[in-house]
Amino acid sequence: MASSETEIRWAEPGLGKGPQRRRWAWAEDKRDVDRSSSQSWEEERLFPNATSPELLEDFRLAQQHLPPLEWDPHPQPDGHQDSESGETSGEEAEAEDVDSPASSHEPLAWLPQQGRQLDMTEEEPDGTLGSLEVEEAGESSSRLGYEAGLSLEGHGNTSPMALGHGQARGWVASGEQASGDKLSEHSEVNPSVELSPARSWSSGTVSLDHPSDSLDSTWEGETDGPQPTALAETLPEGPSHHLLSPDGRTGGSVARATPMEFQDSSAPPAQSPQHATDRWRRETTRFFCPQPKEHIWKQTKTSPKPLPSRFIGSISPLNPQPRPTRQGRPLPRQGATLAGRSSSNAPKYGRGQLNYPLPDFSKVGPRVRFPKDESYRPPKSRSHNRKPQAPARPLIFKSPAEIVQEVLLSSGEAALAKDTPPAHPITRVPQEFQTPEQATELVHQLQEDYHRLLTKYAEAENTIDQLRLGAKVNLFSDPPQPNHSIHTGMVPQGTKVLSFTIPQPRSAEWWPGPAEDPQASAASGWPSARGDLSPSSLTSMPTLGWLPENRDISEDQSSAEQTQALASQASQFLAKVESFERLIQAGRLMPQDQVKGFQRLKAAHAALEEEYLKACREQHPAQPLAGSKGTPGRFDPRRELEAEIYRLGSCLEELKEHIDQTQQEPEPPGSDSALDSTPALPCLHQPTHLPAPSGQAPMPAIKTSCPEPATTTAAASTGPCPLHVNVEVSSGNSEVEDRPQDPLARLRHKELQMEQVYHGLMERYLSVKSLPEAMRMEEEEEGEEEEEEEGGGDSLEVDGVAATPGKAEATRVLPRQCPVQAEKSHGAPLEEATEKMVSMKPPGFQASLARDGHMSGLGKAEAAPPGPGVPPHPPGTKSAASHQSSMTSLEGSGISERLPQKPLHRGGGPHLEETWMASPETDSGFVGSETSRVSPLTQTPEHRLSHISTAGTLAQPFAASVPRDGASYPKARGSLIPRRATEPSTPRSQAQRYLSSPSGPLRQRAPNFSLERTLAAEMAVPGSEFEGHKRISEQPLPNKTISPPPAPAPAAAPLPCGPTETIPSFLLTRAGRDQAICELQEEVSRLRLRLEDSLHQPLQGSPTRPASAFDRPARTRGRPADSPATWGSHYGSKSTERLPGEPRGEEQIVPPGRQRARSSSVPREVLRLSLSSESELPSLPLFSEKSKTTKDSPQAARDGKRGVGSAGWPDRVTFRGQYTGHEYHVLSPKAVPKGNGTVSCPHCRPIRTQDAGGAVTGDPLGPPPADTLQCPLCGQVGSPPEADGPGSATSGAEKATTRRKASSTPSPKQRSKQAGSSPRPPPGLWYLATAPPAPAPPAFAYISSVPIMPYPPAAVYYAPAGPTSAQPAAKWPPTASPPPARRHRHSIQLDLGDLEELNKALSRAVQAAESVRSTTRQMRSSLSADLRQAHSLRGSCLF
């Protein structure tokens, strides 16, 4: 059985069935023992199935030969097999009825007596027969082993023996016995399969380790039932009978007669339990060997066929082969057995006769005792059986893998091997693996490794599962609630924050509460930074935690409960939003904290929406969601909750806009304070800049970017506003950059971009509507740009008006280039203005700019006022504020306000679009760059581009220019002046673009401010205003016009920046805008005709008039050659606002006045609010100077206002924007004629127009030329306006207002200028684009359609001097006539009633725009919710 065990082992693993079994039989006595054991139980089987007498005889004969083999297998083989096959047999015995162990023990105890004798006696004969039978039985056993393996395999190793084979140990003697017993049982029981006999036979195969074993096994397979009888008969010998009795115990299921007989024959040795087991195996083997061999011989010889039939029933063909082999191979078997013993014994068992079991070695007990190899039961014994078969077993040494493969395949191959010569199987397995032990060891090792790997894999899986669970629980570093939400699977925010790829979990539960909490946790710094917000985030965290539960509970909850739960969540979320907003407003949160907090809130809101949608889906599973929030139904039937969620989303958007504005404002170098205040100021309404700036001009700017700044912030706020516009745009961009992780942020950014694009398109559309005017303005702007380029070196700094036309030109060009450059390139007057501005610049521009935003330029003007004669710092601050305000009020009011809004949307990108319009040449407005500047629509693209890029305030069509001029003017001055110097020749559009890009909000604001000034100057004088429009359009781009007059810049800066910015908040709606634009275009066309006439005729006069400094600088840059003198005067008049001396002398004289004028034209510097008041006051001095310079007392007064502070154009009428409440200054008819009168009136300011386009509007600074010239439109004399020119240009509207209002009210000079101006320009230049901020005391709420409209067409309304608030003009006188109104803005004379109508139309337009915006937001929210839904669904599926 040792061999059979081995073979069985091999067969089990599938190593080599026939040959391997054979080898095993040869290798060890264990095979013999196995044979005896398997014979005993096989005989039992055989006896049932086959004629036991024959089998016994064969076995006896074989056993007679066995003795030699007996010793060989007995000593070590038995032990070996006992150990290995003992394990296998033990396993098999276990697999079998543990009877085999019992029988093995008893047989062992009992076997020693007779078993050993029989062993000796049987082994000796079996030595002889063994050799023969070993060959035969080896072959037959190998074949039978194959067959048995096949049968066992065929049975699927169902039988214990199969198990034994599988274990490879059970196939040891005990394995064979047990298998024999059980196989007999199984063969009897399992025989249901065709292989059941084969199985018995395979169990016989186990015994086939020994030839007789194989025969017995075969017989047993068939003759299980008869075998006991046959064995009893054949084994009458005590051993057999004894064997039968013990084997009965051992066999258990097998008839015990066979075991007793076998035991009688193989019982002799009784040994220790192991020995007993071995003994039992041997006994079994003995019994097999003695009796089964006899039987084998008998059957093989006597009844070869009966044997096969007995053996296999269905496998009879296989049996017959083994039988003939056995018959023919008795001796060969002995030889084979000897060879097998020598080979297999030497290698492994090399002791006993491999093929015959020794009675002593029949101790199969170990099979039961050695379960250690249970796992390796694979039919190794069968493989061993094959070994025994392979007398010629040339081993092909193969790698263990190959051997194992063969062993595994051997079970299937065993049958074939049996059919074929056993040599084939032998060659397949190397000798080292021939032995069952080696094969078993190898298989054990492999299996152990496999189990080890399986264990590791299982551990890894468990670890992974645990990690997954743990990760779900601990996804968030913040509170455990996020983890809980993750568990719930609703942690979109948490996963997002933690960058976990668990989208579904977040979607599952995260959003309600944890979403915020993860937000808070994600922005850990934010909660702490925000204070209130931190608690809010904490509350949101609990809310989130609660939401997941709700989500789980929601299904169970009723619709009402769900609705209530969501409503509570929404209320909590709202409280958090409000707390966060308060924190932001309080300025307690850093920008990054704000962004983080907003992201968290956004995530929480998204989660809330998702929860709502989920609830809706649950409530209406079959109904598609009617809305983004889900279909109304039992759950939220009135969709109130949906509306609330939407409102929350809108609040978040506004908050985001405010945050963006706050973030963007810091970008401008000069709007630090504005930014600082801006964060404090929640520009939540920043989207609606018009409403935001509604207070003062600074307010619009501030509101847009930072409502907080006022006076100092007026410039700053003008700066911040444009800056904010830029900031907002940038903020949109930076927001996207800073919070790219927030999909909503991306969507918002896209929305902002789309809005910007939309605004840009609208601007272009409006510009296209006013294409003729735009072309004219472009031409004018080009001329102005040329002038600017020519006179770029001469142009004064950003705020200062060029002392000479050339300087003004340079200034115009430079503003878009760089304030500093312009400053450097400007001539002495420019230097003076620059000095003033510089004096303001380091402290003012830098400090004020940083403090006030772009008020720095104004601040320079502030500092400059003392130096240049501008009012002291109060005017300076206000002057800076006024100057900006003045510009803001004029340009800024409409442009800044409107632009800031749009810039927010398009500051980042649309302003580029604007750029084409930004260039005064490219987009001068309706009638040239001046008109473009004057006209927010026309200007807006160019200014707005600059503004958006610069400050974003100018982003609004006209307000853009103003913010750039006013809001960002200080910055523009600081940074823009260099550009002017550096880029005198740079096209305005380029300059603006450059400003926008290099200076960012600062330069952008500077151009805006320049535009504002220009607008103010243009607005100051209708004719001049038209030029101013050109200039403004030009200037806004270069901001050179504004920057040229540094000294008056403060006065000019205040000009329209604030109001303009305010007005431009929103040109309300397209319809209103279009209507207003059409009206403006019509009037502008009329004005254009007049201006063209004026421009051609009074170019000289215009040059004489500085044509408000702004207009003049822009034009001067555009066309320095057109009227250097005129420019000088225009610029001087604006310079008067900004810098001293229009031509240099007058401008220098005016500079103090001009700066004062700008200071006076507080609107500019004072940010719209201060514009009228303070800038006007400083403007009065400037205006006085200017008027002196201009020498036109009425116009000089107004132009002084204009000239003194173009920003505070005396001719302007101050209107209070109904939307923003900003004061907008329109040139009063009186103011228009004067320097600004020229600006407001193309005829009055033809030179300015030329200066802007062809240096036409030089009259404001121009001494008498502009005054001398009488605008056909305004009927004002051009020469006084020239002096005012700067003032009028600076504050075209202001001047108009100032002239009207302050023609007598401002300083006498200013008043005289204004008077002169106003008489000259048409009744009043209503500069829609430039709505002076509150600074100009607006008598009425005039909203320049242009300033309001962010679109290019800028319309200049000439209202009668009377109608246009003359009071503002009086107040505006301080507004040193801002740069002459940019090229002749297409001035439209509008009565207050017309203005009101326009206001109404614009208001409707704004309302429509707001409605569109809200609708867009709602759509975006719906789309976002749907997207989140889809993502969550996908995530849930994937998760």
UniProtKB/Swiss-Prot annotation:
Assembly and interaction partners: Interacts with DCTN1. Interacts with MAPRE1/EB1. Interacts with ODF2. Interacts with CAMSAP3.
Tissues in which the protein is found: Predominantly expressed by lymphoid tissues. Highly expressed in the spleen, lymph nodes and peripheral blood leukocytes, expressed at lower level in the thymus. Mainly expressed by germinal center B-lymphocytes, a stage in which receptor and ligand interactions are crucial for B-lymphocyte maturation. Expressed by B- and T-lymphocytes, Natural killer cells and CD1a(+)CD14(-) but not CD1a(-)CD14(+) dendritic cells. Weakly or not expressed in fetal liver and in adult bone marrow.
GO biological processes: delamination; epithelial to mesenchymal transition; neuroblast delamination; neuroblast division in subventricular zone; positive regulation of transcription by RNA polymerase II; regulation of inflammatory response
Organism, scientific name: Homo sapiens (Human)
Described purpose of this protein according to its UniProt entry: Centrosomal protein that plays a key role in cell delamination by regulating microtubule organization. Required for the delamination and retention of neural stem cells from the subventricular zone during neurogenesis. Also regulates the epithelial-to-mesenchymal transition in other epithelial cells. Acts by increasing centrosomal microtubule nucleation and recruiting nucleation factors and minus-end stabilizers, thereby destabilizing microtubules at the adherens junctions and mediating constriction of the apical endfoot.
GO molecular-function terms, A-Z: DNA binding
Comp. bias (Pro residues): 865-875
Gene Ontology annotations for the cellular component aspect, listed alphabetically: centriole; centrosome; cytosol; fibrillar center; intracellular membrane-bounded organelle; membrane; microtubule; nucleoplasm
InterPro entries xrefs: AKNA_Centrosome-Trans_reg, AKNA_dom
Pfam families: AKNA
Stretches for region PEST: 771-804, 911-932
Extent of Low complexity compositional bias: 533-544
Protein modification: Phosphorylated; phosphorylation regulates dissociation from and reassembly at the centrosome.
Protein name in UniProt: Microtubule organization protein AKNA
Keyword Metal-binding: no
UniProt keyword terms in alphabetical order: Activator, Cytoplasm, Cytoskeleton, DNA-binding, Microtubule, Neurogenesis, Nucleus, Phosphoprotein, Transcription, Transcription regulation
Listed Polar residues bias regions: 263-275, 879-891, 929-940, 983-999, 1303-1317
Residue ranges, compositional bias (Acidic residues): 89-99, 778-792
DNA-binding region: 1115-1123
Protein family: Belongs to the AKNA family.
Ranges annotated as biased composition (Basic and acidic residues): 1-10, 25-35, 71-83, 276-285, 1135-1147
Subcellular location: Cytoplasm, Cytoskeleton, Microtubule organizing center, Centrosome, Centriole; Nucleus
Annotated spans, Disordered: 1-394, 507-562, 659-682, 775-942, 977-1005, 1095-1165, 1180-1211, 1252-1329
Modified residues (Phosphoserine): 52, 316, 499, 534, 767, 770, 848, 886, 997, 1010, 1172-1173, 1228, 1377, 1387, 1424
